[in-house]
């Protein structure tokens, strides 16, 4: 049952959607006539922005609806398998910049998390925020204990009820869409909302972001290509994150990078190497690598170092996903479309009864024109996009982990080519993928497997004679038990056979006595019946053994 507050919010959402003419998204279909009639008969609201494109109207509507919808639009901008370019491009322009809330209020919430006055632990706290977004706000300070510059990231007050209310309405809408439009079920709208809810709630937990940052920092410890700021978990909590303050050039500021003498070619190639290292070596990748979260160090511009912030959203791939992904990319660039089709079936991404020949032909038809371009002009992200779009026609369900990966790959690829338009992603990535595959399935993989098990066998080897003796002894005892069970079983079978024999003789004698008695023979029937009863008793006794 919808509550009054939910109804009020739902009315606001519908009002904004109609004011921006978003009912134009509804297809011409008998099932959509009612929603279109509602605009005219119930709300009397006209499209107030007919001069703007549909994509721009969608972006403006989401901005007006607030932070939950802005972030949802940002996530949807990466789903180019669902939206055409003119929609996805507009969604990508959504900026997660909102009016800052009062610095004194931010300080109060920080002190609640810290358990005391902020001056106890920090000096030079600046009440003017360094940055403000829909989920959190950032202020600068220095640590009292050592004078290190830090930033304090605090969750916006009262943001959770707003998020929960809007997510609940999103679920209602997703269920309606799935019910009204059966063809939308393959897109799994309810699961898309569920994935978004998880992502959003993860971002509300500052300790989760701290843990992700610590993991990524450890993975690239002493790396010359990627730096992750230090987290100060002693001062952090669910609502507050304290981290090292960094100085760098925002990656989208091309002019500043050039002015600093940055080696743009190496910087772009490092971006690709960092991404594939995270995915294939670590199985743990930063999945929110938009320009606002990525900086470049001022130091050593000839060997530039990336700086990664905001690890609230990360992705992981299991061993099978990594292998199928690597094999797919290698098969693509060798134009082995049969292999691509077989990999999709083997992985379970498409149904097992898929016609391989038809699937191969569909992939070839879509992807062969792509490879007519020079390799340096081919987009990895768009190759995956075309593949997923084709596979959807063969009932491939959305794979959330692959969507997150595709989004990140598009970010990395876009950044790399923005920095250095001649970036050849294939030349950079191919050696990495081939080396990784050889280590997974080649002779080196066998050596690595033996090496990984060596400590275990080294520990167990001294115990081997004792384990062998115990095994033989237990085997002997087991054989004795089996022999005894077999003897008991055979004895039981013999007893049951003897019992059936006695019952048969007894029954025969009783029947004979009955026949004789009916013929007025008196002595013999009595003796026959007595013998029959005796045989029955013998049979009953045999059954009990």
Swiss-Prot record:
It holds the Pfam family ABC1. The keyword Transferase applies. This is Probable protein kinase UbiB. Pathway: Cofactor biosynthesis; ubiquinone biosynthesis [regulation]. The lineage of its organism: Bacteria, Pseudomonadati, Pseudomonadota, Gammaproteobacteria, Vibrionales. It is found in: Cell inner membrane. Residues 124-502 form the Protein kinase domain. Its EC number is 2.7.-.-. Belongs to the ABC1 family. UbiB subfamily. It is an enzyme of class 2 (transferase). It is a multi-pass membrane protein. It comes from the Bacteria. Keywords: ATP-binding, Cell inner membrane, Cell membrane, Kinase, Membrane, Nucleotide-binding, Transferase, Transmembrane, Transmembrane helix, Ubiquinone biosynthesis. CDD domains: UbiB. InterPro entries: ABC1_dom, Kinase-like_dom_sf, UbiB, UbiB_bact, UbiB_kinase. GO terms for biological process: regulation of ubiquinone biosynthetic process; ubiquinone biosynthetic process. PANTHER family: CHAPERONE-ACTIVITY OF BC1 COMPLEX CABC1 -RELATED, PROTEIN ACTIVITY OF BC1 COMPLEX KINASE 7, CHLOROPLASTIC. The chain crosses the membrane at residues 498-517, 521-540. The active site is at residue 288. ATP binds at residues 130-138, 153. Is probably a protein kinase regulator of UbiI activity which is involved in aerobic coenzyme Q (ubiquinone) biosynthesis.
């Amino acid at each position: 049952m919808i509550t009054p507050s939910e109804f009020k919010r739902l009315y606001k959402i519908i009002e904004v959607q109609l004011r921006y003419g978003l009912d134009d998204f509804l297809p011409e279909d008998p099932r959509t006539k009612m929603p279109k009639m509602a605009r005219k008969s119930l709300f009397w609201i006209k499209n107030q922005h007919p001069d703007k494109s549909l994509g721009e109207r969608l972006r403006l509507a989401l901005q007006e609806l607030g932070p939950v919808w802005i972030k949802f639009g940002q996530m949807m901008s990466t789903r180019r398998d669902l939206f055409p370019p003119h929609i996805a491009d507009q969604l990508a322009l959504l900026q997660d910049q909102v009016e800052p809330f009062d610095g004194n209020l931010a300080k109060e919430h920080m002190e609640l998390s810290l358990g005391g006055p902020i001056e106890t632990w920090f000096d030079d706290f600046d009440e003017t925020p360094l940055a403000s977004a829909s989920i959190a706000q950032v202020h600068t300070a220095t640590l009292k204990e050592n004078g290190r510059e830090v930033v304090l990231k605090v969750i916006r007050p009262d943001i959770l009820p707003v998020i929960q209310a809007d997510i609940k309405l999103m679920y209602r809408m997703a269920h309606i869409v799935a019910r009204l439009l059966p063809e939308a079920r393959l897109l799994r709208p309810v699961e898309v909302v569920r994935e978004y809810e998880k992502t959003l709630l993860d971002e509300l937990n500052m300790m989760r972001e701290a843990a992700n940052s610590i993991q990524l920092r450890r993975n690239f410890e002493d790396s010359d290509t990627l730096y992750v700021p230090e987290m100060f978990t002693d001062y952090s909590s669910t609502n507050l994150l304290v981290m090292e303050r960094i100085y760098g050039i925002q990656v989208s500021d091309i002019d500043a990078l050039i002015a600093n003498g940055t080696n743009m070619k190496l910087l772009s190639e490092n971006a690709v190497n960092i991404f594939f290292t995270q995915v294939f070596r670590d199985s743990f990748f930063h999945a929110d690598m938009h320009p606002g979260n990525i900086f470049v160090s001022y130091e050593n511009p000839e060997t530039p170092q990336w700086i990664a912030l905001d690890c609230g959203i990360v992705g992981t791939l299991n061993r099978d996903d990594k292998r199928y992904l690597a094999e797919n990319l290698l098969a693509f660039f060798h134009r082995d479309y049969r292999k691509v089709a077989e990999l999709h079936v083997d992985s379970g991404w498409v149904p097992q009864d898929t016609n391989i020949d038809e699937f191969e032909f569909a992939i070839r038809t879509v992807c062969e024109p792509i490879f007519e371009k020079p390799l340096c002009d081919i987009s990895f992200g768009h190759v995956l996009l075309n593949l997923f779009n084709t596979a959807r026609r063969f009932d491939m369900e959305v794979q959330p982990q692959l969507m997150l990966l595709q989004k990140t790959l598009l970010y990395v690829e876009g950044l790399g080519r923005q920095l250095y338009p001649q970036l050849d992603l294939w030349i950079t990535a191919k050696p990495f993928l081939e080396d990784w595959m050889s280590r997974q399935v080649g002779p080196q993989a066998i050596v690595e497997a033996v090496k990984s098990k060596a400590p275990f066998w080294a520990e167990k080897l001294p115990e081997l004679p004792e384990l062998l003796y115990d095994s033989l002894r237990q085997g002997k005892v087991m054989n004795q038990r089996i022999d005894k069970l077999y003897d008991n079983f055979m004895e039981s079978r013999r007893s049951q056979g003897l019992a059936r024999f006695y019952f048969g003789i007894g029954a025969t004698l009783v029947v004979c006595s009955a026949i004789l008695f009916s013929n007025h023979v008196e002595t013999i029937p009595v003796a026959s019946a007595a013998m029959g009863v005796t045989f029955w008793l013998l049979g009953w006794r045999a059954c009990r053994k």
